[in-house]
C-alpha cells in the first residue's frame, strides 16, 4: 500500500512541476468541496475526490519529508500538510516519549530563565511542524552526569548512558573546582567515547554541593562553574550547557517546581526548586548520610551474621537486589522476610531482617549509629520553610517531592516518606503531598539533561558559546557564568 501511495504521490509532484495546478485552482482549494463532474479535477488533481481523513492518512504514510515537500504543490496540500495533528503524529513516532516532548517544548523551550506555567493547560499552543523541523536539526550532544560517587555519560540521541565509572575511585573529589582534576576527568570521558571535544555541544550535570545561601557558598558555586567553563572551552568545546542535578531530576518528572530529595553518595540533599531555580534563600537541607552509609551499614549487618563477600561492590549489588523500605518498621520485624539473590562470580546470598533494616537508617539514623536528622524530618522542615517563604505563584508548588539518586530506587521509599510526612506535618501543609519515585531510576538527572538537549531551542536558549564566554569574562570578570 505504501509503495502504491508513493507512486501516486510521484505523479502529484510531477503534475505540480509541469504546472498542473494553476493559480485559479488555489482559490478552489480554499472553498467548500463540491461534487466533481466526470473527468473534472480540482486543485488536488485525481485525489480531489478523496475524503480529508484519507488524504491525511496518505501524508502520514508518506512521512515527514514528503509531507513538508507537499506544501509547494498547491494551497490545498499546504493546508493539509501544515495540520498540527499531522506533525504531532510524526513527533510521536520519534525516539522520545510524547509527553516528554510536549513538556520540554512547552516549559523548557525558552531556556533556564523562563518557565511558562506548571501544567499543560496554561501553556501556549505549540506549532508541532515548527517543533519537528527544529528538533530534526538539533545537534547531538555529550551528556556528563558526574557525581561524587559515580558518573554516567553518553550521547543525547541514545536511549540511555553509554558508559559509567566510579568517580571517587578514578578521579577523586571532582566537586572541588580544581582545573587539572576537572580537565583529567572530562578528557577521560571524551577518550572513552572516542569523540573530539570540538565536534559537538556538551551538557554537564552540576553536582549538589556548596548549597548554603552564604557568601562563601555562592562564591564556591561560581568558582566551580568558572573552572568548568574554562576547562571545556580550553578543550575547544563549541557550546556548553550546565544545569543543577536536582533541577534535571525534577524536569525528568515533568515538573519545574517542587522539592527534590537526592540520596547522593555521601549525603542526602533536600532541594526546593521553583520554576527551575534552586531556592537557596529558602534553604537546602542536607543530611549527613547517603548511599555509601547504607552500603556500609549492610556490610556491618552481614559481617555480624558471618556472611562473607569479596568487596563493597558485592554488598552494593546485594543492597540493590534485596533491600527495601518497610512501611512499618516494627511490624516488619515480626514477618518472615528471608530472600536470596545471586551475585555473578560469588554465588548466592540470603538476607532476612537486613533487607529492611539497612534502609531504615534513613528514617532512624540512630540504628546505624549516625547522629543525623531523619529523612522525613528534613523534608518536613524544608516544606515548612517553603510554606513560610514569600514565593509568588502556585501556593502548592512545594508539595510535589521527587526522589533521585541510586538508593532512592529502593522499593517502598516513596510510600513510606509520603506516609511519614502526612503524619508529621499539619493538615494545611500535608494536604495534597505527593512523593514521586525516580522517573528514570538511577539515571533521572541524565534523562533530564537528555530532555533539554533535544528541545528545539537547545543551542540558542540553553548553551553558552566560547566567544560569549571569552567576551563576558573580559567584561565582567570570571564569576559571570553563574547566570547560565
UniProtKB/Swiss-Prot annotation:
One of its GO terms (cellular component) is actin cytoskeleton. The keyword Nucleotide-binding applies. Keywords: ATP-binding, Cytoplasm, Nucleotide-binding, Nucleus. It comes from the Eukaryota. PROSITE patterns: FBOX (PS50181). Pfam families: Actin (PF00022), F-box-like (PF12937). It is found in: Nucleus, Nucleolus; Cytoplasm. GO terms for molecular function: ATP binding. Its main location: nucleus. InterPro entries: Actin, ATPase_NBD, F-box-like_dom_sf, F-box_dom. Residues 44-90 form the F-box domain. ATP binds at residues 262-265. Belongs to the actin family. Plant ARP8 subfamily. This is Actin-related protein 8. It comes from Oryza sativa subsp. japonica. The gene is ARP8.
Amino acid at each position: 500500500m505504501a509503495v502504491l501511495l508513493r507512486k501516486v504521490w510521484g505523479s502529484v509532484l510531477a503534475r505540480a512541476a509541469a504546472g498542473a495546478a494553476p493559480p485559479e485552482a488555489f482559490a478552489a482549494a480554499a472553498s467548500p468541496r463540491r461534487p466533481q463532474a466526470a473527468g473534472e479535477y480540482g486543485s488536488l488533481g485525481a485525489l480531489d475526490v478523496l475524503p480529508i481523513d484519507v488524504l491525511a492518512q496518505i501524508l502520514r504514510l508518506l512521512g515527514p519529508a514528503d509531507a513538508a515537500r507537499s506544501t509547494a504543490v498547491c494551497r490545498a496540500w499546504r493546508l493539509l500538510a501544515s495540520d498540527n495533528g499531522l506533525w504531532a503524529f510524526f513527533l510521536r513516532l520519534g525516539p522520545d516519549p510524547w509527553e516528554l516532548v510536549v513538556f520540554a517544548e512547552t516549559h523548557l523551550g525558552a531556556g533556564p530563565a523562563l518557565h511558562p506555567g506548571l501544567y499543560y493547560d496554561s501553556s501556549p499552543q505549540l506549532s508541532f511542524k515548527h517543533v519537528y523541523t527544529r528538533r530534526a536539526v538539533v545537534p547531538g550532544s555529550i551528556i556528563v552526569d558526574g557525581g561524587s560517587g559515580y558518573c554516567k555519560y553518553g550521547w543525547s540521541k541514545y536511549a540511555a548512558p553509554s558508559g559509567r565509572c566510579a568517580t571517587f575511585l578514578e578521579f577523586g573529589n571532582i566537586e572541588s573546582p580544581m582545573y587539572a582534576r576537572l580537565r583529567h576527568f572530562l578528557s577521560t570521558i571524551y577518550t572513552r567515547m572516542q569523540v573530539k571535544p570540538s565536534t559537538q555541544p556538551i551538557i554537564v550535570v552540576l553536582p549538589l554541593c556548596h548549597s548554603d545561601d552564604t557568601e562563601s557558598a555562592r562564591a564556591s558555586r561560581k568558582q566551580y562553574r568558572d573552572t568548568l567553563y574554562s576547562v571545556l572551552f580550553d578543550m575547544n568545546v563549541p557550546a556548553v550547557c550546565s544545569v543543577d542535578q536536582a533541577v534535571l531530576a525534577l524536569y525528568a518528572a515533568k515538573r519545574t517546581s517542587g522539592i527534590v530529595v537526592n540520596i547522593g553518595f555521601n549525603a542526602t540533599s533536600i532541594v526546593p526548586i521553583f520554576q527551575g531555580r534552586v531556592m537557596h534563600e529558602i534553604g537546602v537541607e542536607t543530611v549527613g548520610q547517603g548511599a555509601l552509609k547504607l552500603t556500609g551499614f549492610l556490610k556491618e549487618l552481614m559481617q555480624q551474621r558471618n556472611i562473607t563477600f569479596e568487596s563493597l561492590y558485592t554488598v552494593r549489588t546485594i543492597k540493590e537486589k534485596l533491600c527495601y523500605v518497610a512501611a512499618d518498621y516494627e511490624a516488619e520485624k515480626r514477618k518472615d522476610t528471608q530472600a536470596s539473590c545471586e551475585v555473578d562470580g560469588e554465588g548466592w546470598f540470603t538476607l532476612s531482617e537486613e533487607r529492611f533494616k539497612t534502609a531504615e537508617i534513613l528514617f532512624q539514623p540512630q540504628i546505624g549509629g549516625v547522629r543525623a536528622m531523619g529523612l522525613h524530618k528534613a523534608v518536613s522542615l524544608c516544606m515548612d520553610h517553603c510554606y513560610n517563604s514569600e514565593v509568588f505563584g502556585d501556593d502548592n508548588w512545594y508539595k510535589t517531592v521527587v526522589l533521585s539518586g541510586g538508593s532512592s530506587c529502593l522499593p517502598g521509599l516513596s510510600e513510606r516518606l509520603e506516609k511519614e510526612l502526612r503524619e508529621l506535618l499539619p493538615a494545611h501543609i500535608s494536604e495534597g503531598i505527593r512523593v514521586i519515585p525516580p522517573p528514570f531510576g538511577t539515571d533521572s538527572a541524565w534523562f533530564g539533561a537528555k530532555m533539554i538537549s533535544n528541545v528545539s531551542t537547545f543551542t540558542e536558549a540553553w548553551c553558552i558559546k566560547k566567544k560569549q564566554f571569552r567576551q563576558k569574562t573580559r567584561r565582567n570578570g570570571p564569576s559571570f557564568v553563574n547566570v547560565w
